[in-house]
Swiss-Prot record:
Entry annotation: catalytic residues: 187
Organism: Allorhizobium ampelinum (strain ATCC BAA-846 / DSM 112012 / S4)
PANTHER family found in the cross-reference section: 3-METHYL-2-OXOBUTANOATE HYDROXYMETHYLTRANSFERASE
Record's protein name: 3-methyl-2-oxobutanoate hydroxymethyltransferase
Residue sites binding Mg(2+) per the record: 49, 88, 120
Keyword Magnesium: yes
Pathway note: Cofactor biosynthesis; (R)-pantothenate biosynthesis; (R)-pantoate from 3-methyl-2-oxobutanoate: step 1/2
GO biological-process terms attached to the record: pantothenate biosynthetic process
Positions of 3-methyl-2-oxobutanoate binding: 49-50, 88, 118
Similarity comment: family membership: Belongs to the PanB family.
Amino acid sequence: MSAPPRQKRLTPTTIAALKHQRPIVSLTAYTTPMARLMDAHCDLLLVGDSLGMVLYGLDTTVGVTLEMMIAHGQAVLRGVNRACVIIDMPFGSYQESREQAFRNAARIMKETGCDGIKLEGGTEMAETVAFLVERGIPVLGHVGLMPQQVNTSGGYRSKGHDEAEADKIRADATAIAKAGAFALVIEGTVEPLAREITQTLSVPTIGIGASPACDGQILVSDDMLGLFNDFKPRFVKHYAELAGVISKAVEDYATEVKARQFPGPEHTFQPRKS
């Protein structure tokens, strides 16, 4: 007997066609259980290199490896039936040359079954984006605040405050769109500029710390769920406060274990009566 047919997932082409139709709903996903919970509600799930900070406790995304991205991409794809799944290319896996970028992007797609890759960069990456797209690899661009470049760009600060910086972001967005990216993430960019870019480009923009006028929005799922209490970026809204819920659950568990209240009779196995 053959396996039941898998529901057809949304594709980069589907996502691109949503511009001027309705907002694109996107979140990051790193594991199978979370992907299953998000799948019905999200158009696009990004296996972001933010996993280095969220799951592994790294200070930046620079330490994330290709192997980490592939492993988590495989996990997410196991939990998805509907959403388009895009995987971040980690720092150092695509900047050296167009050939390096294609080799690693092709590996990601082959080993995970994802729908495309995301890479950071502007005018300097346009030729690479075109090279990938021409060879069958859908690309989600990323301009504005680029986390992989925090060591050379002044850290995690919003972009586009002065005209020179704004002009650079405009040029970056235009170049990546013209190179063939199916959509573009705009991160940490002043609202009027993100709005202007969205209205100018023919491809969808997905904002994070950008503008409500963007064609879609994305957040780091762990931020949105309130799993971190020590720092909350300005652009994050907590739709839940799971850090407190989890902490209380663990506290209650510990209390019951110490008091020998858990496991109770309903949680243990008794011999069958003959």
